[in-house]
A protein has these predicted regions:
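N-terminal beta-loop-helix "entrance" segment that forms/cooperates
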Residues: 512-520
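Hydrophobic/aromatic interaction determinants used to assemble and anchor large protein complexes
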Residues: 1-411, 416-486, 490-500, 504-513, ...
């Protein structure tokens, strides 16, 4: 009874402590958000020029006052209690403290930066910019961000765990905002340079105003990324979260952007050469944004590829595999589209420009993704021994084999549905091949990818099996003290034991003498030595007894 109480009491106490921390930090998060919303509403009313504070929006003013005067003091009191508890190392090491800081840091950073950049961009080309509302929101949440950044960087009370989350959040957010805005600004500028000013209302908004607004967002996002990546020390962190963010955003997302932009550029050039249906201005419409996406995406991808080269071996291998996967997806999509368009031309040789455009799209996707995949994967230099197979390579092969197999299965089901629908129903218009050409192209592309990766996996699995040392069939089980070897069926039974001797102290028999334990023996393919029973195959069958 006492032992059970002593073992369950710490578990119950730990669960209650974790629940208490969770409730406290969740309540503090809610109160901080409530106080910031109320404060931003009051500041907006104070900054509004020519606006009465109460005006007609009594409910809005009452809400702002309640949030500020009730939620704000409660948040301050609860924060003071939490701050005093952080003198205990166990409180600083709890996951709740790190999650709270990361959550409020992310929300305050995103809201404040978005509001301030929106306010700055609203002054460009606007006759009456509405700056009071975004400025009040930006100031209130910027104060929350500065406060929590100070706690995150505190020399003593900073979180012991998840201390890299704010740097990662700031870097990823700034990189995404800066990249998207840079593509928009450069794309607008290139579009004007290629096609000229095509605005229908030039007297309302000139061509340079949206470019300049996008440039403001690009500069703001790049500043946030630089502050967290360089000044905040995110580049020097060697944690799994930083590696995942670097690969997921800097390699995967940037690679998709660069390949998509390059594919559209090749597609437009092919259409200019072989498919000039329609006005030239409409044909050149996607060229400017595509060039911008290819340029900015390639720049971001190249920087993170070089930055990942100074990290661990696993990070470098993962970045290479991710690049190969993105390029392979583009190339496989191109193969499927080419098969689809080829079947459409075979069904109707007099097909219009739509089929030709589809074929050019598939060729452009294959022309962009194929060389990048060949350079990243290097199919001519595959591992020849088990020692040269990277650990994550087999996971990559299994993932691509599984995904492509699922896609092929879905395409096969769609083909079967179209065939039975054509045979059983009164379907008019279009042949059977015309109905199944799209899923058939997808099936062929997915089948090729699945078969290739499965063949590689089988080959590398055989190399690993051949290189693994042969293991003896050993039964890891220690027998009892009085364990006896198996009964010998080919030998005569031993004679019965003699009667037990009489004890000299009484009429009863004495205790049987202790039987000596055999240290080793062998019986056929079984051998006993050192407390282990081992089975080893025999070269010749044994006919005699042991």
């Amino acid at each position: 009874m006492n032992a059970q109480v002593s073992t369950t009491a710490p578990t119950a106490g730990s669960a209650q402590l974790t629940l208490r921390r969770l409730i406290i930090y969740a309540l503090l998060f809610a109160l901080v958000v409530i106080g910031a919303v109320g404060l931003s509403g009051l500041v907006e009313r104070l900054l509004g020029t020519g606006v009465v504070v109460a005006s007609n929006d009594v409910a809005g003013l009452a809400r702002s006052l309640a949030f500020t005067l009730i939620g704000g003091p409660l948040a301050a009191v609860l924060w003071w209690v939490v701050w005093k508890r952080l003198d205990d190392p166990a409180e600083r090491a709890s996951a709740g403290w790190g999650l709270y800081l990361a959550g409020v840091y992310a929300v305050s950073l995103i809201v404040s930066v978005t509001a301030l950049l929106g306010m700055a961009a609203s002054f460009i080309g606007a006759r009456e910019p509405r700056w009071s509302s975004p400025l009040s929101v930006g100031l209130a949440w910027a104060g929350i961000w500065i406060w929590h950044r100070w706690m995150w960087r505190h020399p003593v009370k900073h979180p012991a765990h998840l201390d890299d989350v704010p740097a990662v959040i700031g870097s990823v957010f700034g990189l995404l905002v800066g990249t998207v805005a840079a593509i928009s600004a450069l794309g607008g500028l290139l579009d004007v340079a290629i096609r000229g000013d095509t605005s229908l209302t030039p007297w309302v908004e000139t061509w340079w105003q949206p470019v300049l607004r996008a440039l403001v967002w690009a500069v703001g996002g790049s500043t946030v990324w630089w502050w967290h990546w360089f000044r905040g020390g995110g580049r020097k962190l060697r944690t799994a979260l930083v590696d995942v963010a670097l690969i997921g955003v800097g390699i995967f997302a940037a690679g998709i952007t660069a390949l998509a932009g390059a594919g559209v550029v090749v597609f437009v050039l092919l259409r200019m050469a072989f498919d000039r249906d329609g006005p030239m201005s409409e044909l050149l419409g996607p060229l400017g944004p595509a060039l911008a996406a290819a340029a900015v995406g390639s720049l971001v991808w190249r920087y993170h590829r070089v930055s990942g080269a100074h990290r661990s071996v696993a990070t470098r291998r993962a970045s290479q595999l991710v690049t190969s996967g993105v390029a392979l997806a583009a190339a496989a999509s191109g193969i499927g589209v080419i098969i689809n368009a080829t079947l459409a031309i075979a069904v109707s040789p007099l097909a219009g420009g739509g089929t030709r455009t589809l074929l050019l799209g598939g060729i452009s996707s294959l022309a962009v993704g194929g060389p990048v995949w060949w350079q990243a994967w290097k199919p001519g230099r595959q591992p020849q021994t088990a020692e040269t197979i990277p650990p994550g390579r087999r996971v990559y092969l299994i993932v691509f084999f599984g995904i492509s197999a699922v896609v092929a299965l879905i395409a096969l089901l769609v083909i079967g549905f179209r065939i039975f629908e054509y045979l059983l129903g009164n379907v008019t218009g279009g042949s059977l091949l015309d109905r199944v050409r799209a899923p058939l192209g997808l099936l062929v592309a997915a089948g090729l990818v699945s078969a290739y990766h499965f063949a590689l996996w089988r080959r590398e699995h055989a190399l690993l099996v051949a290189a693994s040392p042969a293991q003896a069939h050993t039964i890891r089980q220690v027998t009892s003290r009085w364990w006896q070897p198996p009964t010998r069926t080919c030998c005569p039974r031993p004679s019965p034991a003699p009667p037990a001797p009489k004890s000299r102290y009484g009429e009863g028999p004495t205790r049987a003498p202790r039987r000596r334990r055999r240290k080793a023996f062998r019986h056929g393919n079984l051998s006993w030595s050192g407390g282990y029973l081992t089975h080893s195959p025999a070269s010749q069958p044994r006919t005699s007894c042991w």
